Every structure is written in C-alpha cells, then in structure tokens.
C-alpha cells in the first residue's frame, strides 16, 4: 500500500505488516544504513531501503500514537479516537488523521497554524485601531499645508480630517503634529502670529464658531478668566456709582423727618445727641431755620445737592445706616467760615470718619466716661467691688449727681424734654446712655451706707482675724 499524500511512495511500496515490529535501536540503525546505501548507489540498496524506510516512517509518525502507554490513562484515552484498533494498526490512525489526531505530532508541534499566516491577529496588517508611525511621506503633506498657511497655522476641523485621510494618520496625530510644528516655528522665530489659548486650540479640534475667521478669533483671544472678572467688577462698580448718586441725591431729604421725630419721641438718637458737646457750631446749626441744614452745612453743598460725591466714603451704602444716623459724616468736621476758601467744598485736611465710628451712631449707646455708672447699676445686686465707695458711705460726691434721678418716673420723657441749648457740658456728661431710665428702675436703698455697713463690717473683721492668728502660730513653732 502506498500513501502518495505523505510524499513517501517508494518507502512504503514493499513494506509489510511484519516490518513494523522492530525495536527502536534496530529501526534507527536500519534507517541509517538505508540512507548510506541510497547515497552510495550500490546494487541491492532498494530492497534494503524498502523495509528500513517503512520502519523509519512508521517510527516517526507512530511513535506517540501507540496504544500501550496511553490506553490505560483515562485522560489520554478520550483524545485517541481509535485506541482499541491502534494496537494492530498503529500507523493507520496517524496517517489518515493527520490534522485531527493529537498523537500525530508531539506536543512541541501542537501550535495552531493560523498565527503563521497572520502574526498580528485576524487583521493582515495589524490592529487598525493602533496608531501608525508618521512617515516622511505623510508629514510632507502636512508641511506643504503649513507652508501655505504660515500666517494662520491653525487648521480647522474639516482640514484636519482631510489631512488625516490623505496622510492615513489619526486626527489626534495630525493635531499633535501641528502643535509641535507651531512650537518649532516659535522657537526658530521664523514667523509670528497671534497666540491662542489652549482652550481655543482644543476647541478648534472639535470645531468652533470662529473657524476660518482669524479676526474674530483674535477678539476671542483677548477674553480670559482674569479679564472677565475685571470687566464684571468694573460694570458692577458702574452700577454701584449710579445707585450711589441716586442715594446721595435723596439722602438730604429722607433722614430729615426721622431726625425730628427722634428728638421728640426720645429715641436712642436723642440721648446720643445729648452726649455731644454743645459749644461746637454743630449744635447751633441744628436750630437753623433753613431746610436740610442738618445734613448740608456748607452753602455750596446745599446748592449742589450731592454732598457725598467728593468724600472718600465706601461705595456700598446701607439704607438702614443712613436712616439711623441722620447726623452722619458731614457733621464730623465743623463748617468753615463764610469767607474761608473752603466754604464751598469740604476741607481736604480734615479727616473723614465712617458714620459707624461717630459718637452719634446708634451703636455707641454707652459713653466711655460713664462706664462705671453702667457697671454699678448692672452689678448692684451682686455686691460688686465697684460700689465699695457707696457701700462705705464715702461716695457722697458720687451719689450727689444721682439725686435728681431718684424721684424721676420710669418713662423716658423727662430727659428728652430738656432743650439742647439749656444743657452744659457737665449735665451732658451725666446723661450717659439711652437706657438711663432703666438704671433708675433698679431698686436703690435711700441710705446704702447705713444698711450695707453692718453686713460689710463682719466681713472685714473676719478677714483680719486670720492675720492676728498667724503671729501666734509662728510664735508657737519656735517654742515647740
């Protein structure tokens, strides 16, 4: 029998079944002798080579297909389709089932044949998603486009897609190449053009509204985060200045009525006004019959109606602050005489203060000089040490100013009814706070010295008792 598909017809023509039973060393020796005889060309080598060649081919193709060592193992018997018949025809299974039988070739040759034809996978030229290196031919097209657009080397999205198709490159590779080319041109100082921000350069990749229009693109380049913030602040300041002008125009007329009502009804503003010294021209200016004189003291400012424009006040105005402080910043500096050069405008040398820091503001309810009066009334029940002079009876001069206030009724009308012109500096200092009537409501004994002396004296004696006992103890120690 012959197997022409194996390429060995001359070796298997005269071979018989009895020739397959030789030992492996004898088979190898016979194969070597047959090869030597065929090379020398001696007569009789064909018959010798017939049996030896058949044994050699059988040993090569059927050495791993023998049923003896593999039939007993259950793992390998499943892979051998004719395990029972291979004992008689060991060469048949391997020769007819060359591709399917795992026993045909050893495990070292068990690799699949497909990778030999397509070494990079199922695609003939590799994965198409893998970016390919840019060659000199592909970059020459990009260089030609760059030379034509030296003034504006920013290709649009459509141009990038066209160049990517021509050069067989990806869109990212084209964009990166142009970015590097622009960087090289800037380093070489060969060309200068309007610089673009990175956001706009990335926006050109996905298409922008300013593509192909360099003038519009340059206008957009001037807008960045810092300029946007500054522009917004400038616009906001412009709106604030317009609102400030309106507030300044309405300010002289609006607080006039609340100031008059405050003096009549005894609000905290009235008590704060009493604390001011009355010898300054400001106190006389309150009784002036001209309308708006409480706010505008200079004739030039009264005629103009905008007294706060030249002042260095903050731009943010508070309507509540303007309403609660009718005698605000313009009263901080006394008005110059009529013949003075600064009569028609504010003096440049006079320091301007914010209304919150003026004595007339509602926050300053307690005068600094009368802080002791506040503490005496607040801590009277606790027996504060601040009242020690009144406890000991030494505070006769201190209690004298409080004499007129003891029979005074609780309502706040009596301190408000006093005219500003009738008060002098001493009486104004007595009026310490808008909560002055509340201090009078505190129950005060008629003779604090007589009533509070008796509980205070034992405390003093008790404090002296340990001092007298200490010398006795110290004297007894040396004697012991």
UniProtKB/Swiss-Prot annotation:
PROSITE patterns listed in its UniProt record: HOMEOBOX_1 (PS00027), HOMEOBOX_2 (PS50071)
Kindly state one GO CC term assigned in the UniProt record. nucleus
Q: Which GO terms describe its molecular function?
A: DNA-binding transcription factor activity, RNA polymerase II-specific; DNA-binding transcription repressor activity, RNA polymerase II-specific; RNA polymerase II cis-regulatory region sequence-specific DNA binding; sequence-specific DNA binding; sequence-specific double-stranded DNA binding
DNA-binding region, residue range(s): 125-188
In which residue ranges is the amino acid composition biased (Acidic residues)?
210-228
Annotated region Disordered: the residues are 190-268, 280-354, 401-480
Q: Which GO terms describe its biological process?
A: cell development; negative regulation of transcription by RNA polymerase II; neuron differentiation; positive regulation of gene expression; proximal/distal pattern formation involved in metanephric nephron development; regulation of transcription by RNA polymerase II; specification of loop of Henle identity
Ranges of biased composition (kind: Low complexity): 252-262, 340-351
Modified residue annotations for Phosphoserine: 241
Q: What's the family?
A: Belongs to the TALE/IRO homeobox family.
Would you tell me the protein name for this molecule? Iroquois-class homeodomain protein IRX-1
Identify the species of origin. Homo sapiens
């Amino acid at each position: 029998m012959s197997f022409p598909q194996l390429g060995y017809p001359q070796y298997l023509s005269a071979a018989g079944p009895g020739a397959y039973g030789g030992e492996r060393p004898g088979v190898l020796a016979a194969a070597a002798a047959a090869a030597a005889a065929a090379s020398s060309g001696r007569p009789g080598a064909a018959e010798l080579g017939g049996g030896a060649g058949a044994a050699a081919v059988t040993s090569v193709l059927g050495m791993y297909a023998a049923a003896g060592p593999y039939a007993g193992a259950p793992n390998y018997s499943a892979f051998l389709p004719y395990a029972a018949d291979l004992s008689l025809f060991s060469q048949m299974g391997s020769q007819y089932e060359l591709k399917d039988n795992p026993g045909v070739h050893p495990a070292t040759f068990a690799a699949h044949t497909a990778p030999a034809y397509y070494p990079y996978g199922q695609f003939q030229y590799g994965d198409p998603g893998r970016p390919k290196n840019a060659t000199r031919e592909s970059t020459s097209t990009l260089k030609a486009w760059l030379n034509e657009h030296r003034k504006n080397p920013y290709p649009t999205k459509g141009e990038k897609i066209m160049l990517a198709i021509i050069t067989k490159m990806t869109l990212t590779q084209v964009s990166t190449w142009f970015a590097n080319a622009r960087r090289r041109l800037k380093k070489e100082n060969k060309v200068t053009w309007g610089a673009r921000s990175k956001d706009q350069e990335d926006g050109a990749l996905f298409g922008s509204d300013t593509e192909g229009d360099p003038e519009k693109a340059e206008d957009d380049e001037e807008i960045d985060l810092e300029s946007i913030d500054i522009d917004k602040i400038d616009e906001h300041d412009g709106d604030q200045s317009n609102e400030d002008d309106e507030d300044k125009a309405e300010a002289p007329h609006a607080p006039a009525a609340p100031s008059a009502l405050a003096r009549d009804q005894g609000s905290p503003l009235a008590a704060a006004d009493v604390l001011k010294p009355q010898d300054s021209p400001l106190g006389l200016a309150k009784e002036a019959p001209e309308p708006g004189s409480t706010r505008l003291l200079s004739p030039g400012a009264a005629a103009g109606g905008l007294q706060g424009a030249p002042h260095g006040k903050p731009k943010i105005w508070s309507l509540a602050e303007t309403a609660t402080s009718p005698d605000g910043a313009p009263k901080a500096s006394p008005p110059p005489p009529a013949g003075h050069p600064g009569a028609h405008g504010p003096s440049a040398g006079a320091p301007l203060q914010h209304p919150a820091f003026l004595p007339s503001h509602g926050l300053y309810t307690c005068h600094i000089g009368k802080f002791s009066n506040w503490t005496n009334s607040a801590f009277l029940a606790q027996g504060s040490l601040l009242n020690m002079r009144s406890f000991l009876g030494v505070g006769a001069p201190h209690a004298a100013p409080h004499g007129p206030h003891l029979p005074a009724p609780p309502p706040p009308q009596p301190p408000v009814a006093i005219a500003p012109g009738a008060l002098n500096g001493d009486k104004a200092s007595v009026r310490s706070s808008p909560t002055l009537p509340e201090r009078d409501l505190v129950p005060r004994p008629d003779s604090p010295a007589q009533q509070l002396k008796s509980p205070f004296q034992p405390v003093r004696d008790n404090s002296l008792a340990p001092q007298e006992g200490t010398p006795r103890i110290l004297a007894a120690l040396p004697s012991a």
